[in-house]
Amino acid sequence: GAALPSMRLLAKELHISVPTITKLVQELIEEKIVNDLGKVETPGGRRPNVFGLANSAIYFAGVNVGRDNMTYVITDLQNNIIKEVTDSSFELQNRPQCLEKICSNIENFINDCGIDRAKILGLGVSIVGRVNPETGRSYMYFTSSEESLRDIIEKRVNIRVLLENDTRARCYAEYNCSRSKEESNVIYL
């Protein structure tokens, strides 16, 4: 993995003096955004302290819009699930009322999840059918609007949204959160 940053490395990378970076990092530690991870062994000289983002500094939200349910999840930086809810009463229909329900369900989950909205860096939304993640459009559902599905949801929840096909999203999650990362070739069925 990548080396954890020390004060000297942070100062060099950010073109800031060591005293200034020390003050800034101390403020981030006080705000519980950064953790002091302790000293590391070096070939010689003083052992520097290294720093990393605190798990509670940033969160991610995920929503799977299935044909007959919706699943919502909040994770921290280490992919630990903080909260997960499944709504089995949801039924996907290609109607404006259903899009309104999707948006209000997501808003309610975000509001009730117990995490400060400002700490939720992004929202991944997966939906069945063909999706263009670059344009944020679904080719099967809610296609009558000039705005993409991603943009509609993003405006409603006020969090950056990534829209993806449900199978690709599950494959990516399986690859990213499991031992599959050690493999050079993976097939997802």
Identify the function of each model-found stretch:
Residues 3-4, 34:
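Conserved hydrophobic residue
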Residues 4-5, 9-14, 28:
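A short alpha-helical element within helix-turn-helix/winged-helix DNA-binding domains
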Residues 17-24:
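Short coil turns linking two alpha-helices in DNA-binding domains
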Residues 36-58, 163-186:
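Conserved phosphate-binding catalytic cores of ATP/NTP-utilizing and phosphoryl-transfer enzymes
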Residues 84-185:
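Glycine-rich phosphate-binding loop and adjoining helix at the ATP-binding site
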